[in-house]
Structure formats: structure tokens, C-alpha cells
């Protein structure tokens, strides 16, 4: 009775596309192999037949579960393409949505700190805004960039089945980021003279410098927080991050009210609440890793002290790549502040950047998701799955960006009312709306491409590309158009758009010519190099 059933299944799958046939046949082989026999699945990777007898526990994009080890076969029909799109879309948003929500909650910690401080006084609000946007934002971007090396290493190690190395990589990153935080201490300690040197009013700089020294513990919390985040992201364990972010934001609001409104601690209370919330997030994530991530966490290990120098170089390349992007937009604001009528120029640009920042939170989530997808699939030896995940993500992100741009253009005369009642400011914002729309489209692609770069381990070349496109092309062009023509703030922004466009085109071309089979081989070599301690851990475990 078993044979006719199997023949019927194979017959029914013959009319489907190659992708669906592979799924059906793989499932048949799994059923017929029996519970006691090893699973043997024939899959097509690198255009040749391979037999795999050991499943890798990276998430399979083929079956949508953790029971598959096959790469996607080539797409040969619209039905195949549709199935790939459905599977990849599901995988993408399972990761991206919780990460985006977590980022929104973290952004809310800063926002509510400013809101509560704003009720203390305008001077205090200006001082805290400077402390958070200049000093804290600088260290935030640099530490986040340093931790991004884990997106490459943990993601590919997870795909390759080297689960024990995930905890080692995380501990190694903890050490490096804690050391980096020590190096960044002078920026906090000497914030007051540095801010005065940058042209800030002495009274504001004095208060800002005092607040900055009080939030030093928050910086060290980030050194623990970021590597732990990347550890969880690489395994797609992002739901817990969203819950921790939500409870942390709720607790932060309560502590702010308690310290500022009840205890009347003023700025000291705001700084204390900021530190407590940051460490609460870091500790909660570590507790979850130690208690519920037994596959990746095997306890503290001396292996974390091995290969620190090459790990540091990859971390530094990741930091430079990210910081060049963050500082690019900060520099645009600085240039705008030296134009005629800087109040309207900076105000209108800040409103547009604020709107762009809210859209950016979504794409930061997508950035992390595609980084996880690419690194997992390369580590698993799935070149087509990596390629298809990139294609699907780029298309969907572009559609979202276009929709956002259309909404901005339709409401260009009205959306600024959220931020200001000034008719002059609203008109200035409306004049910039078309540039905001173009920027939103570009920003729908740029984070995705950066995520692919991190997932593939391309940080160093992308850092050079960013340096050229942003600082050798975009900023000089913006300076010329803004100061040497009558375009003003629009000219500066056009220069920024040109730099971002050039960077996006270059990276899209890099992805277009990428040999994904070769990327799999490089990922395998990287795991052999970086996972030197994996065999030691296996021996210890046995």
C-alpha cells in the first residue's frame, strides 16, 4: 500500500515547477527514509549533485522550517518565483518587524528623556539635546558599528552549524567594546571644552558636559547590549528583544516620572533614569542568553581571548562603514547652520530629517534582517537562497520607499504642522518635500545594501566606497551648490543625494556581479579561520 501512495505523490508533483518538485521529493525522501535511518536528501548546489547526511540547523528557506538542508533550485517559472517571494517575505518580516519595534522603543528612551527634561527648562533641554545628539550619538554609532562584525561571524557560524562559537564570538566582542568604551571616556569627561570648541554657548556646554559625565554608565551598558543583540539576531531570536525593549521603555517612563516629578532630582534624575534603563536592557538580554540559549551559550570561555587582533580589525571596519554614514548626515546639518537665516534653514531640514528618521527605523530593522538572512544562508552553503533573499528584500524595500515618497509629496503642504505653527517654516519644509521624497526612496535601498555587505563580510571595501562617495563627492558638491549658488539648503541636500545615489549605484553593481557560489566558499573559509576553537569545544563537549 505504501508504493502507490509514493507514486501518486511524485506524479502529482511532476506538473509543478522545479522548485515545488524539489520540495515534494525532499519531503518524500524524508518520509521513506524511516525514523531510524539517516536522512539523505539530494540537492543541487553549485550546479552539481551532493548527498547530505547531516542536517545543518540554520533556518531553511526552502521548506520554511528547520528540517531542510537544500538550496533553492533555479527559478524557471512565474510559479517558482511566486513561491520564493512568499517564503522569503515571511522569513524577512519575522526578523525585521520585531527588530524595528525594538529600535522604536530604544528611540523612545531618548525621546522621553528629552520630553521630561523639557519640562525642567529650555536651557536644560538644549543641553541634554546636545549631549545626546553629539556625544552620546557619536559613541552609540561607533559601538554599534564595532558590534556589527558579529552579524557576519555569528550569522555565518549559525548557518554552518558552529553553534558553540556564537557565545565565544559574543564574549570576544564584549571585551573589545568594553575596551573601546574606555578609549571613548575622554570624549565624555572633556565634553564641556569640546562643545565650546565646536561653537556652543558656554552656559549650555557646561550643563551638557555635566550631564554627559553622568551618562557614562550608559555607554558601558551599550558595550554589553550590542553584542548580545547581534548574538540573538543571528539566530532569529528577535521576539524577546522586542519584549525587552517594550518593558524597558515602560519602566523608563515610570522612572523618569519618579526621579524628576516626585523626587525632584532634575537633570541628575534624568541621567540616573537613562543609566538604569540602559543597564536594565543589557542585563535582561544577558539573562535570557544564559538561561534560554543553551545551544549558543556554553559559559565563559578562554577562547574569547584568542584571535582578538583580526576580530578587532573586522570590528573596526564595520564601525568605520557605519560611522561614515551617520557622520555624513550630521555634517549636512553643520553645513546648513552656516547659511544665511540658519534658523529657518536648520529648522526645515531638521523637520525633514526627523520624518526621514522615522522611516529609517523600519529600514534599520530590514537591514538587520537581510544581514541575518544572507549570513545564515552563506554559512549553510545556500548561494541561491542568499541571492534570492537579496532580490526579494530590495524589491519590497523599494516599493515601501516609493509609497512613503508619494505620501510625502501629497501632504507636502501639511505634514510640517506636526512640528511647527510658523507659516514661513512650513513653506520652507514644503519646498524641500521633493528632496525628502527622493531621499526616502534612496534610504529604502541603502540600508538593505549595507545589510547585505555586513552579512557577506564586505565591510572594508564598503567603508572605502562610503568615504569616496560621501566625503570626496557628496559633501564637496553640496558645499558648492549650497554656498556658491542661490540654492542654499536645497543645494546642500542635492549634494547629499548625489553622494548617496552614487554609493547606492556602486553597491547595487557589486551585488549584481557577485558570484554567490564564491561567497559561500569564502564564508566556509572564514568559518575555518575564525572557528578554530570549534573543534576544541566539540572535544570538551564529548
UniProtKB/Swiss-Prot annotation:
Cellular location(s): Membrane
Any Gene Ontology biological process: xenobiotic detoxification by transmembrane export across the plasma membrane
One family name in Pfam for this protein: MatE
Signal peptide: none
Keyword Translocase: no
GO molecular function list: antiporter activity; xenobiotic transmembrane transporter activity
Keywords: Membrane, Transmembrane, Transmembrane helix, Transport
InterPro entries named in the record: MATE_euk (IPR045069), MATE_fam (IPR002528)
Bilayer disposition of the protein: Multi-pass membrane protein
CDD domains in UniProt: MATE_eukaryotic
Membrane-spanning parts: 97-117, 127-147, 176-196, 204-224, 240-260, 272-292, 316-336, 344-364, 390-410, 435-455, 462-482, 491-511
Coiled coil: none
A cellular component annotation (GO) from this entry: membrane
UniProt family annotation: Belongs to the multi antimicrobial extrusion (MATE) (TC 2.A.66.1) family.
Protein name: Protein DETOXIFICATION 34
Organism: Arabidopsis thaliana (Mouse-ear cress)
Amino acid at each position: 500500500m505504501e508504493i502507490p501512495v509514493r507514486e501518486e505523490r511524485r506524479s502529482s508533483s511532476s506538473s509543478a515547477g522545479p522548485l515545488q518538485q524539489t520540495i515534494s521529493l525532499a519531503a518524500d525522501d524524508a518520509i521513506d527514509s524511516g525514523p531510524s535511518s539517516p536522512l539523505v536528501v539530494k540537492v543541487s548546489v553549485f550546479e552539481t549533485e551532493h548527498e547530505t547526511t547531516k542536517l545543518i540547523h540554520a533556518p531553511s528557506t526552502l521548506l520554511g522550517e528547520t528540517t531542510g538542508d537544500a538550496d533553492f533550485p533555479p527559478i524557471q517559472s512565474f510559479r517558482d518565483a511566486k513561491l520564493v517571494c512568499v517564503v522569503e517575505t515571511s522569513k524577512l518580516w519575522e526578523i525585521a518587524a520585531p527588530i524595528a519595534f525594538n529600535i522604536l522603543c530604544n528611540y523612545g528612551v531618548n525621546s522621553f528623556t528629552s520630553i521630561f527634561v523639557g519640562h525642567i527648562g529650555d536651557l536644560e533641554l538644549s543641553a541634554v539635546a546636545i549631549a545626546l545628539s553629539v556625544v552620546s550619538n557619536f559613541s552609540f554609532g561607533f559601538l554599534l558599528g564595532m558590534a556589527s562584525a558579529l552579524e557576519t561571524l555569528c550569522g555565518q557560524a549559525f548557518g554552518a552549524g558552529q553553534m558553540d562559537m556564537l557565545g565565544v564570538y559574543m564574549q570576544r566582542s564584549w571585551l573589545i567594546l568594553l575596551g573601546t568604551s574606555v578609549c571613548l571616556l575622554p570624549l565624555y569627561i572633556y565634553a564641556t571644552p569640546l562643545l565650546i570648541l565646536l561653537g556652543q554657548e558656554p552656559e549650555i556646554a557646561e550643563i551638557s558636559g555635566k550631564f554627559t559625565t553622568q551618562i557614562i554608565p550608559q555607554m558601558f551598558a551599550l558595550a554589553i547590549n550590542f553584542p548580545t543583540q547581534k548574538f540573538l539576531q543571528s539566530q532569529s531570536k528577535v521576539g524577546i528583544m522586542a519584549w525587552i525593549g517594550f518593558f524597558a521603555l515602560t519602566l523608563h517612563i515610570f522612572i523618569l516620572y519618579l526621579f524628576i516629578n516626585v523626587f525632584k532630582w532634575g537633570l541628575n534624575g534624568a541621567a540616573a533614569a537613562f543609566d538604569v534603563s540602559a543597564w536594565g536592557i543589557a542585563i535582561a538580554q544577558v539573562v535570557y542568553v544564559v538561561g534560554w540559549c543553551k545551544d549558543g551559550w556554553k559559559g565563559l570561555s578562554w577562547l574569547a581571548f584568542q584571535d582578538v587582533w583580526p576580530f578587532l580589525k573586522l570590528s573596526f571596519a564595520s564601525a568605520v562603514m557605519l560611522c561614515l554614514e551617520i557622520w555624513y548626515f550630521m555634517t549636512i546639518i553643520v553645513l546648513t547652520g552656516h547659511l544665511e537665516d540658519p534658523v529657518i534653514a536648520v529648522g526645515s531640514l531638521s523637520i525633514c530629517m526627523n520624518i526621514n528618521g522615522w522611516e529609517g527605523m523600519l529600514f534599520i530593522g530590514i537591514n538587520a534582517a537581510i544581514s541575518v538572512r544572507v549570513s545564515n544562508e552563506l554559512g549553510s552553503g545556500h548561494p541561491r537562497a542568499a541571492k534570492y533573499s537579496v532580490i526579494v528584500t530590495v524589491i519590497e524595500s523599494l516599493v515601501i520607499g516609493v509609497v512613503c515618497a508619494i505620501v510625502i509629496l501629497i501632504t507636502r503642504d501639511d505634514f510640517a504642522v506636526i512640528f511647527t505653527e510658523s507659516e514661513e517654516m512650513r513653506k520652507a519644509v514644503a519646498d524641500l518635500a521633493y528632496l525628502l521624497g527622493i531621499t526616502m526612496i534612496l534610504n529604502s535601498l541603502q540600508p538593505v545594501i549595507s545589510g547585505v555587505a555586513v552579512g557577506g563580510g564586505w565591510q572594508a571595501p564598503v567603508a572605502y566606497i562610503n568615504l569616496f562617495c560621501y566625503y570626496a563627492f557628496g559633501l564637496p558638491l553640496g558645499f558648492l551648490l549650497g554656498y556658491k549658488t542661490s540654492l542654499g539648503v536645497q543645494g546642500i541636500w542635492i549634494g547629499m543625494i548625489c553622494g548617496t545615489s552614487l554609493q547606492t549605484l556602486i553597491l547595487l553593481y557589486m551585488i549584481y556581479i557577485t558570484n554567490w557560489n564564491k561567497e559561500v566558499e569564502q564564508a566556509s573559509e572564514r568559518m575555518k579561520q575564525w572557528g578554530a576553537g570549534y573543534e576544541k569545544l566539540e572535544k570538551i563537549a564529548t
